[in-house]
């Protein structure tokens, strides 16, 4: 996890936002990371590719998290995917009709979209920007109700 992420997750949880981990990899790897960083309580649910049987950008990854959170199709407009991989996270969210946010601070993957499907709705350059963005999006949704 990136520096500052644990604090962001803490802020989001305390503000009443529900957080899911939708990730490609092995369950054991994420268990180790959770324990190492004492993050077991920050995610309400996890949809990990080893368990789901597919990797992002497959919609099944996102649908699994939604089902575990008892969310329906109509709830997608309230869901935000924050990810560092254009091809998997952003494409997957965009295909599902979920608001996509690129974690532009990640050096792990390329940050320049090559097509419209890879273009995120928003980009954050530092984890500390995430709570304010989510609060802004939440207020926009409240105004649309």
How would you label these PLM feature ranges?
Residues 6, 10-13, 17-145:
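Asp-based, Mg2+/Mn2+-dependent phosphohydrolase catalytic module
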Residues 2-3:
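Active-site core of PLP-dependent enzymes with the aminotransferase class I/II
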């Amino acid at each position: 996890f990136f520096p500052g992420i644990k604090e962001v997750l803490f802020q989001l949880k305390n503000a009443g936002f529900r957080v899911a981990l939708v990730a490609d990899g092995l369950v054991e790897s994420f268990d180790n990371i959770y324990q190492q960083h004492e993050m077991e309580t920050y995610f309400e649910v996890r949809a990990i590719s080893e368990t789901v049987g597919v990797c992002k950008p497959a919609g099944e990854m996102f649908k699994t998290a939604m089902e575990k959170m008892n969310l329906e199709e109509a709830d997608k407009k309230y869901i935000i995917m924050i990810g560092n991989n254009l091809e998997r996270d952003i494409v997957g969210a965009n295909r599902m009709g979920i608001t996509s946010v690129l974690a532009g601070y990640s050096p792990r993957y390329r940050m320049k979209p090559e097509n419209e499907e890879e273009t995120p709705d928003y980009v954050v350059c530092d984890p500390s920007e995430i709570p304010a963005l989510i609060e802004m999006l939440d207020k926009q949704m409240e105004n649309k109700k």
